[in-house]
Curated annotation (Swiss-Prot):
Function: Riboflavin-binding protein which might have a role in retinal flavin transport.
Pfam families: Folate_rec
Disulfide bonds listed in the record: C79-C149, C86-C126, C119-C163, C132-C145
Family indicated by similarity: Belongs to the folate receptor family.
Compartments it resides in: Secreted, Extracellular space, Extracellular matrix, Interphotoreceptor matrix; Cell membrane
InterPro entries in UniProt: Folate_rcpt, Folate_rcpt-like
GO MF: riboflavin binding; riboflavin transmembrane transporter activity; signaling receptor activity
Post-translational modifications: Not N-glycosylated.
GO cellular component, one term: extracellular region
Protein name (record): Retbindin
Species assigned in the record: Homo sapiens
Biased composition (Gly residues): 219-229
Reported tissue expression: Expressed in peripheral retina (at protein level).
Region feature (Disordered): 189-229
Amino acid sequence: MDCRVHMRPIGLTWVLQLTLAWILLEACGGSRPLQARSQQHHGLAADLGKGKLHLAGPCCPSEMDTTETSGPGNHPERCGVPSPECESFLEHLQRALRSRFRLRLLGVRQAQPLCEELCQAWFANCEDDITCGPTWLPLSEKRGCEPSCLTYGQTFADGTDLCRSALGHALPVAAPGARHCFNISISAVPRPRPGRRGREAPSRRSRSPRTSILDAAGSGSGSGSGSGP
């Protein structure tokens, strides 16, 4: 009984953190950062119960004077237009997190870390897109802004740094090659943009997880090494 009492709050915290992750992915639409620290989200349960989530100020300096949003479906101005590949990837990730959240509530799935390949694919698909900071901030605080609109590539060292910075303890990153981790499957990813640096293209293409990742909603034990069934 005592063990059960201690375990339930931990499970609830993880569910709330996962909920926050997919809601912010949906709200950001792939063009703005995932900026709400995975821990210390004051009043999150109440906001989720009311079906609303307050997102703090916008990203770029030119948008700093806009007012903070206060209702569902009303979000700050975007900082640039997302690339098709980044937007598509984040849409798939958001849907996978939503499915994972539902399975978690039903007790079908246990908490698993993110596959390292998923993080690298996220970074590869969004490297040239705008992000507004390396971490998420608590929902009760106003968001700070970088001096300029920086890209993922300018902000994060690699995919692992991206996941650890943006998602924190809500969804930790598994060790490279881990066999039991959280991943997603993308059937078709838009072609790389012409502006991508040619010297990086070969290494990107060699990373199969960028275009083919395991299904998070239907697979509880993804293969971080990329080995198929």
